[in-house]
Amino acid sequence: MNTRSFGNEMKRLGFDFYTGVPCSFLKNLINYAINECEYVGAANEGDAVAIASGAYLGGKKPVVLMQNSGLSNAVSPLVSLNYPFRIPVLGFVSWRGQPGYPDEPQHELMGQITTKILDSMQVKWMYLSTDMRTAKRQLLLAMRYIEKDNPFFFVVRKGTFEQEPLQKQLRPFNYPRISHASKAENEFPARQEALRIINGWKDGKTIQLATTGLTGRQLYEIEDASNNLYMVGSMGCVSSLGLGLALSKPDFDIVVIDGDGSLLMRMGNLATIGYYHPPNMIHILLDNNAHDSTGGQQTVSHNVSFVDMASACGYANSLYLRSLDDLDACLQKWKNKKGLTFAHLQISTRNEDPPRRPAVKPHEVKERLASFLNRGHLEAEGAES
């Protein structure tokens, strides 16, 4: 099938935001996406799904591309982010290890179970046809599922896409500012105190994304608002979600509130965020060296220099925060002068009271956030006119 013709049909239908991890079976479609659309190369397949989900919240129709060997990496966000929040994505997964066809031994088992994994996740799927007319009809069918807030995947056989040469890519290098070398004080603030400071800087152009566990629950108790999103499950994906949203909504301030256990799970996304460097995003790490919501088991965060890592990955500003006053000053500076920022605050494991879970359902959180973003977009258009 002619890759450019298929890609142009996708673009006509509104699919112009792509993210994923390469596969030789999909390389020509990936090349088209890089040449003609917005493409975000993800650190892993799960991050790609989360990035696409953030782009969807920002009004895009996202496409996720991956090899089937990485489909298992995408299971967590598909079942605990996209399913409960009812966030649709259009996926293309290659069929390496297709039974009856020669392939490398590492693809043998996944080739046998690829479609079974999709079935078990209740993801509708279809083998992508190599006939353009048929493929166009398949895209329209996929659209019907996506319009009902369901993900849809195409399983792609070898040789489906004809050659699409990759145009020369720019390789920007981001020069980060030197990290502040100050260390945290002995008396660490509580998470609730930090969240109150963060929430105090929220305005009508701010979106707050809180990682799974106690962070989201405590933010909910401080103030439940339509421009808050509380992650449930999909641990480690909050920064990926923030990247997708920041890239698709550059006129909004995206505040990502992460935890040490969460960030440790998907540290590769630091490099992806640093490369695409959305200036309207601040990534705040509240680090208590523990998995607090599961009993306080220790993480290895005390052995990791997150600030140096973020700086090395291309964050424009990376800094240690010594106190709540530092956090307040950091947010004020970022609000006044944007730039991709990573801020690390050591917090205690003490909690005032066990926080209750949000009463609002995840898909309701998504729907009201989408309405908030749409209102903000319309207000901006009205101001310009």
PLM features per residue range, with description:
Residues V79, I87-L90, R266-D287:
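A short alpha/beta connector and helix-capping loop motif
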Residues I282-G314, Y320:
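A contiguous pocket-lining binding segment that forms or flanks enzyme active sites
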Residues Q208, I254-I257, I284:
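Residue-level marker for buried hydrophobic side chains located in beta-strands
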Residues V63-S69, F252-L263, G268-L270:
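DG-centered beta-turn motif at the end of beta-strands
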Residues D16, K61, P279, A316, ...:
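Short acidic/polar active-site loop segments enriched in Thr and Asp
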Residues M1-L243, L247-S248, F252, L321-L324, ...:
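Thiamine diphosphate
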Residues L140, S323-N336:
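A short, acidic, amphipathic alpha-helical segment used as a generic capping/interface helix at domain edges
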Residues P151-V156, G339-L345:
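Active-site regions of oxyanion-processing enzymes, predominantly non-cytosolic
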